[in-house]
């Protein structure tokens, strides 16, 4: 039987992976300057409003979706209720954004990310696999969308 991981070691690793994904690249899996917020800082509202491909979402929709996902996760964990949601709403309703709307979306994402970090800070134990996978999921989910955004930028900026 494997030795259990101490909660503080797991939490520290989660914070490191979150930081790499959202803010500060350590080279664990991203290249320098490619975290989510570093990437978003290079995108104008006009670029964020362009659908990449015929039926594809805009980058603005990608950002709103990630914030929506993080907020939903935090609410569900805090309340203990998995509320039903319309996963398609953000994709249907988000397209062209003004500069002000784009900046507000990025700020909302930052707020959502900070709420997730507070939730993790409030977690003193990782009692089962569901808690652990639920903590890893936002890293994986956000990394997926970061990849989508970075691939779209190859089309939009080149």
PLM regions and their residue ranges:
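Short, contiguous alpha-helical
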Residues: 1-30, 37-40, 45-90, 126-158
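Hydrophobic alpha-helical core bundles mediating ligand binding, dimerization, or RNAP-core interactions
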Residues: 22, 29, 33, 109, ...
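Acidic/histidine-rich alpha-helical segments that form the ligand environment
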Residues: 92-126, 130-142
């Amino acid at each position: 039987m494997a030795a259990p991981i101490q909660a503080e070691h797991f939490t520290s690793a989660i914070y490191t992976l979150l930081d790499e994904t959202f803010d500060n690249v350590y080279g664990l899996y991203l290249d320098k300057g490619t975290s989510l917020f570093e990437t978003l800082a290079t995108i104008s509202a006009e670029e964020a409003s362009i659908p990449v491909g015929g039926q594809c979402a805009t980058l603005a929709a990608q950002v709103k979706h990630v914030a929506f996902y993080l907020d939903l996760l935090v609410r569900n964990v805090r309340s203990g209720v998995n509320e039903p949601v319309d996963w398609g709403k953000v994709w249907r309703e988000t397209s062209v954004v003004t500069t002000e709307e784009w900046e507000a979306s990025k700020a909302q994402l930052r707020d959502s990310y900070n709420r997730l970090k507070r939730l993790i800070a409030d977690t003193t134990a990782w009692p089962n696999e569901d808690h652990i996978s639920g903590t890893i999921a936002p890293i994986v989910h956000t990394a997926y969308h970061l990849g989508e955004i970075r691939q779209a930028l190859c089309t939009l900026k080149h």
